[in-house]
Design a protein with these regions (language model features):
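Short glycine-rich, polar/acidic loop-and-turn segments at beta strand-coil junctions
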Residues: 36, 55-57, 65, 92-94, ...
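Solvent-exposed, flexible loop/coil residues
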Residues: 50, 98, 166
Length: 171
């Protein structure tokens, strides 16, 4: 019988690193300390909270991140500041409004980290190629984009409908 210091399942290096920072065994890359944290579920403002980050992941949120702070950890004192979770825009239509870059310039400073966008306007105008080009433009952006598939039907006779084979390619 062997004993393990970690969990009985295999973890990738990234997961182990994240867990070690969360447990205070290893310093994180970034620590935000002395923050007021908004709990969006209860509406409470929690005082003197700390957040520890490793790579792009939040590893710890709580009152004391001292064990996750090392000599290389960047520490931000957020006294007098309120920290909120990233916001999700659950319904937008980016295909016709403006460029992605222009939109990002306005929404990132407000705390949006994820956008769900419709693609229904694109197919009737530019077909499958237009939708695929738009989806490609959402890749490698500083925030996460999720996109819906275009509607298969249209109230416009001129626009017609989307063939099932095009929908299958998009899904």
């Amino acid at each position: 019988m062997t004993t393990r210091e970690t969990t009985p399942w295999t973890m990738s290096g990234d997961a182990k690193k994240l867990m070690d920072v969360a447990l205070g065994k290893t310093p994180g890359d970034l620590a935000v300390v002395n923050a007021t944290l908004l709990n969006v579920y209860t509406g409470e403002l929690l005082k003197k909270q700390s957040i520890s980050v490793v790579d792009k992941w939040i590893a710890y949120v709580g009152e004391n991140a001292q064990d996750a702070i090392g000599s290389e950890t960047i520490v931000i004192d957020a006294a007098g500041k309120t920290v909120i979770p990233g916001l999700i825009d659950g319904h937008t239509h980016l295909g016709w409004m403006c460029t992605i870059e222009e939109y990002l310039r306005y929404i990132i400073p407000g705390g949006t980290t994820t956008i769900v966008t419709e693609t229904l306007e694109l197919y009737p105008v530019g077909g499958l190629d237009a939708v695929q080009e738009f989806l490609a433009s959402l890749e490698d952006q500083p925030i996460k984009f999720l996109a819906t598939a275009p509607a298969m039907g249209s109230i416009s006779r001129k626009a017609g409908h989307m063939p099932i084979q095009d929908l299958k390619r998009l899904l």
